[in-house]
Amino acid sequence: MKVAVIYFGGQYNHLIVKDLKYLGLEAVAITPDKSVEELKEFDSVVFGGGPYSVINELDKMGFAPDYVKSLNVPKLGICLGHQLIAKVLGGEVRKANKPEYGLTTVNIVDEDTILRGLKPSIKAWESHNDEVVRPPSGFRILASSENAKVQAMVNNDNSIFGVQFHPEVKHTEKGIEVFKNFIKICRK
């Protein structure tokens, strides 16, 4: 399976590629200046983190909004990628009332799909100033934390996922399980 990992300049993006390769996938780092057509060869897309804000810097994210809307493959957004998916598909993203940095308790409210095996909670690495406050229509919330209601979300057909935390960072408990679960879903 070939996975495009969209790089937005986040400090942990290389770890996403490393984890996916460790799990036996062909993971390729892609900058968002490639056209949608150039990504048609991929079986899934993972949107990594980065320094931008989808609130007022969507224009700095190249063709990434088009990837969200136009590529008909399973997608996983991590941190900024999670916020990007929410914003582009009609959810609401705002400056966080209380930004999260470091280890945070993430409470799993629905462990179906990408969070299978992680209930009741995990300690997860966070690094964000913005947050999804309302998922797009047709999405449900999978996890929350004390300061962020939408720590994880999925669409109704279980093909588009977002997580606010960083499963690729070693400090996140069972982070690799998020990727394993995503791969299982992609292979269905």
Swiss-Prot record:
It is an enzyme of class 6 (ligase). Residues 2-188 form the Glutamine amidotransferase type-1 domain. InterPro entries: Class_I_gatase-like, GATASE, GMP_synth_GATase, GMP_synthase_A. One of its GO terms (molecular function) is ATP binding. Its EC number is 6.3.5.2. Keywords: ATP-binding, Glutamine amidotransferase, GMP biosynthesis, Ligase, Nucleotide-binding, Purine biosynthesis. The active site is at 79 (nucleophile), 166, 168. It catalyses: XMP + L-glutamine + ATP + H2O = GMP + L-glutamate + AMP + diphosphate + 2 H(+). Pathway: Purine metabolism; GMP biosynthesis; GMP from XMP (L-Gln route): step 1/1. One of its GO terms (cellular component) is cytosol. Catalyzes the synthesis of GMP from XMP. PANTHER family: GMP SYNTHASE [GLUTAMINE-HYDROLYZING] (PTHR11922:SF2), GMP SYNTHASE-RELATED (PTHR11922). This is GMP synthase [glutamine-hydrolyzing] subunit A. It comes from Sulfolobus acidocaldarius (strain ATCC 33909 / DSM 639 / JCM 8929 / NBRC 15157 / NCIMB 11770). The gene is guaAA.
